[in-house]
């Protein structure tokens, strides 16, 4: 309890160094100021001349719901430890920063209804360390967590059971950086939320997660405890609506739906081949982007999922080449040699573009691209059946998060017997799309964009919300 009081006093002192000036009423200024911090779950630059992140998209949707006259300004602080002090100084109307609801924080701010549950876990290097089985195995080891996080609160409670437990708090390193240090052998353990671990494991496959620490925590937006409650009430109403109409699930799937699709060995192999095989074909992927407008890294991800960048790959059904084209598709696209890497890559990219054009205008990005990839794998006719089935099941046929629930049902007689195109192995396109999404994310982090000398196409934004397109 004494430590809790000290922590609260420290936060209040930080907030009171400057005399807080009242923030202008947003109903007058029509501007909503939101404090957040950089991170994969909050707010980041996606590389497509767009900002992205689950919190970013939620805030954009919320402000859009307030009315067209309202705008949003993001106040981005260096790390999570600065978020609540900034809010207490009245520099923002609320905080959208992947904040867990904790006892300490509830003394300082007012939380909205939660919109996500997360589980804290111990992160370790599975090449250097055995998974700890209990808290005792963390003693006398190097543990670090970011300052000002709920992780340190959790460790403090564990210390009551194991007084010898010790750790350091880093004011300038976030969870991403600390997990990277664990992966590189510079740190024994850190603590992170499961959804963040799943994302980072796609870049560091040697990371393991174990020991669920306590019960799952809830994530919410934070508002000042005092002052007018108009915006707070609007935010609660917003979360009630998006929880009921599927928008929240749609956004969560956009950022985390593909995160745990691949096994560590898949990621390791992909990274190795990115170093050895990808350079041979990069020029061809660049050319495919220049001809179609598709991000070259997306085309490369499709090619890897199809053939592992093996231009001689052939299936038992005679699907062949880098992009695994059927004879019929190759003929329609004018391909004379499916084993020719250039012909295959460019034809495959053109085919994805053709499929995107077939999809109704009601389907926006990035869902439009994910559905085109599903059609690439299973055929456009079966995709249409899945969309029809989704609608029958009271799901949204324009959202990938719902269509991917309907696709596996195409293999069940009670469903496929009622559809025009009948049976299909609908689970395959779900695996295909989610794997491509993950490979694309990895490449987008590791490889720079390609900017043609004479850009003539717009590249779909596959990170942020909505159907925004940005010139690359």
Curated annotation (Swiss-Prot):
GO BP term, example: peptidoglycan catabolic process
Taxonomy, superkingdom: Bacteria
UniProt keyword annotation of DNA damage present: no
EC top class named in words: lyase
Location in or out of the cell: Cell outer membrane
Enzyme Commission number, as recorded: 4.2.2.n1
Entry keyword set: Cell outer membrane, Cell wall biogenesis/degradation, Lyase, Membrane, Signal
Region annotated LT domain, chain positions: 260-472
Pfam families xrefs: SBP_bac_3 (PF00497), SLT (PF01464)
This protein's record includes keyword Plastid: no
Reactions listed under catalytic activity: Exolytic cleavage of the (1->4)-beta-glycosidic linkage between N-acetylmuramic acid (MurNAc) and N-acetylglucosamine (GlcNAc) residues in peptidoglycan, from either the reducing or the non-reducing ends of the peptidoglycan chains, with concomitant formation of a 1,6-anhydrobond in the MurNAc residue
Membrane topology category: Peripheral membrane protein
Segment forming the signal sequence: 1-24
CDD domains assigned: MLTF-like, PBP2_YfhD_N
SMART domains assigned to the protein according to its UniProt record, in alphabetical order: PBPb
PANTHER family: MEMBRANE-BOUND LYTIC MUREIN TRANSGLYCOSYLASE F
The family this protein is said to belong to: In the N-terminal section; belongs to the bacterial solute-binding protein 3 family. In the C-terminal section; belongs to the transglycosylase Slt family.
Job description of the protein: Murein-degrading enzyme that degrades murein glycan strands and insoluble, high-molecular weight murein sacculi, with the concomitant formation of a 1,6-anhydromuramoyl product. Lytic transglycosylases (LTs) play an integral role in the metabolism of the peptidoglycan (PG) sacculus. Their lytic action creates space within the PG sacculus to allow for its expansion as well as for the insertion of various structures such as secretion systems and flagella.
Entry comment, domain topic: The N-terminal domain does not have lytic activity and probably modulates enzymatic activity. The C-terminal domain is the catalytic active domain.
Protein known as: Membrane-bound lytic murein transglycosylase F
Species assigned in the record: Methylobacillus flagellatus (strain ATCC 51484 / DSM 6875 / VKM B-1610 / KT)
């Amino acid at each position: 309890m004494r430590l809790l009081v000290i922590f609260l006093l420290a936060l209040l002192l930080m907030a009171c160094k400057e005399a807080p000036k009242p923030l202008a009423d947003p109903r007058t200024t029509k501007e909503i100021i939101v404090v957040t911090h950089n991170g994969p779950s909050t707010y980041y630059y996606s590389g497509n001349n767009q900002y992205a992140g689950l919190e970013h998209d939620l805030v954009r949707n919320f402000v859009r719901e307030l009315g067209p006259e309202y705008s949003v300004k993001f106040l981005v602080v260096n790390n999570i430890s600065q978020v609540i002090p900034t809010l207490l100084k009245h520099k923002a109307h609320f905080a959208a920063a992947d904040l867990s609801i904790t006892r300490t924080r509830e003394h300082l701010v007012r939380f909205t209804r939660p919109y996500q549950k997360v589980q804290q876990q111990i992160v370790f290097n599975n090449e250097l360390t055995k998974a700890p089985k209990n808290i005792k195995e963390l003693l006398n080891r190097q543990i670090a967590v970011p300052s000002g996080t709920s992780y340190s609160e959790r460790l403090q409670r564990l210390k009551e059971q194991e007084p010898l437990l010790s750790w350091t708090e880093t004011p300038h390193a976030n969870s991403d950086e600390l997990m990277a240090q664990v992966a590189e052998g510079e740190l024994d353990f850190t603590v992170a939320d499961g959804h963040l671990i799943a994302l980072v494991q796609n870049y560091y496959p040697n990371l393991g997660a174990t020991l669920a620490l306590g019960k799952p925590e809830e994530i919410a937006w934070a508002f000042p405890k005092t002052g007018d409650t108009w915006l707070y009430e609007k935010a609660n109403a917003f979360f009630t609506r998006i929880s009921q109409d599927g928008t929240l699930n749609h956004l969560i799937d956009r950022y985390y739906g593909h995160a745990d699709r691949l096994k560590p060995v898949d990621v390791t192999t992909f990274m190795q081949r990115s170093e050895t095989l990808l350079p041979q074909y990069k020029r061809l992927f660049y050319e495919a982007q220049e001809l179609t407008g598709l991000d070259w890294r997306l085309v490369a991800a499709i090619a890897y999922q199809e053939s592992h960048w093996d231009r001689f790959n052939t299936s038992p059904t005679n699907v062949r080449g880098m992009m695994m084209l059927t004879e019929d598709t190759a003929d329609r696209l004018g391909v004379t040699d499916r084993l020719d890497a250039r012909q295959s890559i460019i034809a495959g990219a053109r085919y994805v573009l053709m499929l995107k054009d077939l999809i109704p205008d009601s389907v926006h990005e990035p869902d439009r691209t994910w559905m085109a990839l599903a059609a690439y794998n299973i055929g456009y006719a079966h995709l249409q059946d899945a969309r029809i089935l989704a609608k029958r099941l009271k799901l949204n046929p324009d959202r990938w998060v719902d269509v991917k629930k309907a696709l596996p049902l195409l293999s069940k007689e009670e469903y496929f017997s009622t559809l025009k195109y009948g049976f299909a192995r609908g689970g395959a396109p779900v695996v295909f799309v989610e794997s491509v999404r993950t490979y694309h994310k990895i490449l987008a982090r590791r490889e720079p964009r390609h900017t043609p000398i004479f850009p003539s196409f717009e590249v779909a934004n596959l990170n942020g919300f909505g159907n925004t397109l940005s010139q690359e």
